[in-house]
């Protein structure tokens, strides 16, 4: 059994409509559902202390997650959350399975940008937990400076500078991982060549691995994320709960 914490509307004891389906499915599975208002730093409906508690909702900053963790004991600790949510928590562990990159403060990132531009003519720039959308792909130092200015990136903010890899048209897949067990939508299997990466990430309870394929058909890990704040992408909510959350509840019991 689990307690599931979902986002409420700001200043309201009502689930955010974007998470209504998850609330319905979670309750249908017999889980206790609580609501968290990040704006007020308020938790509605205290979780049952006899059960582990899992957050499912919008991305939280380190401070916001700590605030939630202070209100109730969470299955995923703040340290574990950040280790999956931020690139500096996972990149070094799986360098052989993901495109090359460098994590560096924005004020000192010019060298890394120049290096990757010389390598392939383009590079990918993102924050350690979020991309800049279509603007993340740049082809010059001037574009990099414009990106920093537009998004008001401070010189001390960490950036993830990555080589640009041409990918095939095959759709990217999101795998939810519970400990070392990876689950794909519609019974998709994690490629064998990427399974050793799960061993390098084994200290995490619940995370996601996004897999894409190069133009030569090689599978690569594009991103690791915390499973609590990851969108379901090609999954249905029902499948997520029947497979992934069910397994998580079994192991956490």
For every predicted segment, state its role.
Residues 2-39:
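Short, charged N-terminal beta->alpha structural module
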Residues 3-17, 46-48, 56-173, 177-195:
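Active-site nucleotide/adenylate-binding loops and adjacent lid/helix of ATP-dependent enzymes
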Residues 22-30, 72, 94, 120, ...:
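Hydrophobic, Leu/Ile/Phe/Ala-enriched alpha-helical segments that form helix-helix packing faces
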Residues 35-44, 59-61:
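Glycine-rich, highly charged phosphate/nucleotide-binding loops
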Residues 158-164, 170, 176-225, 229-252:
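A long amphipathic alpha-helix within ATP-dependent nucleotide-binding catalytic cores
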């Amino acid at each position: 059994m689990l307690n599931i914490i979902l986002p409420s509307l700001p200043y309201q004891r009502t689930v955010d409509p974007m998470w209504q389906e998850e609330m319905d499915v979670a309750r249908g599975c017999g889980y206790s559902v609580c609501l968290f208002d990040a704006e007020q730093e308020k938790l509605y409906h205290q979780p049952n202390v006899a059960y582990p508690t899992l957050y499912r909702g919008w991305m939280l900053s380190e401070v916001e997650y700590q605030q939630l963790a202070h209100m109730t004991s969470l299955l995923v600790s703040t340290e574990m959350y950040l280790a999956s949510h931020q690139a500096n928590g996972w990149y070094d562990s799986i360098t052989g399975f993901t495109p090359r990159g460098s994590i560096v403060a924005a004020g000192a990132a010019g060298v890394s940008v120049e290096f990757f531009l010389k390598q392939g003519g383009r590079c990918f720039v993102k924050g350690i937990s979020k991309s800049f959308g279509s603007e993340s792909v740049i082809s010059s130092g001037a574009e990099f400076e414009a990106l920093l200015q537009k998004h008001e990136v401070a010189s001390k903010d960490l950036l993830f500078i990555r080589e640009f890899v041409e990918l095939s048209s095959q759709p990217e897949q999101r795998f939810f991982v519970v400990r070392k067990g990876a689950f794909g939508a519609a019974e998709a299997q994690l490629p064998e060549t990427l399974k050793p990466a799960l061993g390098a990430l084994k200290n995490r309870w619940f995370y996601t691995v996004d897999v894409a394929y190069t133009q030569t058909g090689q599978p690569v890990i594009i991103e690791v994320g915390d499973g609590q704040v990851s969108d379901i992408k090609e999954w249905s909510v029902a499948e997520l709960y029947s497979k992934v959350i069910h397994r998580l509840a079994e192991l956490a019991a």
